[in-house]
């Protein structure tokens, strides 16, 4: 039997809400990707060229994660949720993916965003989990349970 995990990073709580609902619909375990150094409001100020989120746009940046998923080997499908920052996933998602051997696993990205779509997000994440199979993913802002169920079914 296939076992699924919903892992997510949420700076403001929006992605957390979607992740919790998705885990329930998918019958999946839930894991929060917590940054070692929490983000402050100043860190998330998109207009500030020196804010942490702006500096972390560097594709080589790998913000530290505070905890690890001890039983990653148990999962066949890993849903990975995040807010879209600067048209891609925050680099903490790369940190998370690179911490595990995801060879043979299906990675299903999902995001929340104020206006962006997935764009090049999946392509940018694939290099962090070269042995995994990636789904196209989707932005799930305010998704109904029916949309979440369809998303799970399409990515089973």
Regions found by a protein language model. Give the residues of each.
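P-loop/Walker A phosphate-binding loop and immediately adjacent motor/lid segment at beta-alpha junctions
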Residues: 50, 105-106
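N-terminal beta1-alpha1-beta2 submodule of the flavodoxin-like/Rossmannoid cofactor-binding fold
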Residues: 1-77, 87-89, 94, 98, ...
């Amino acid at each position: 039997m296939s076992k699924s995990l919903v892992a997510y990073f949420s700076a403001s709580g929006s992605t957390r809400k979607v992740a919790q609902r998705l885990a329930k619909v998918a019958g999946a375990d839930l894991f929060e990707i917590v940054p070692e150094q929490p983000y402050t409001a100043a860190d998330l100020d998109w207009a500030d060229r020196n804010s942490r989120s702006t500096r972390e746009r560097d594709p080589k940046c790998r913000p530290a994660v505070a905890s690890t998923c001890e039983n990653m080997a148990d999962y066949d499908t890993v849903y990975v949720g995040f807010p879209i920052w600067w048209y891609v996933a925050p680099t903490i998602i790369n940190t998370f993916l690179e911490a595990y051997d995801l060879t043979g696993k299906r990675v299903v990205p999902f995001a929340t965003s104020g206006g962006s779509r997935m764009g090049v997000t999946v392509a940018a994440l694939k290099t962090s989990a070269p042995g995994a199979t990636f789904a196209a993913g989707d932005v799930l802002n305010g998704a109904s349970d029916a949309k979440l169920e369809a998303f799970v079914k399409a990515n089973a």
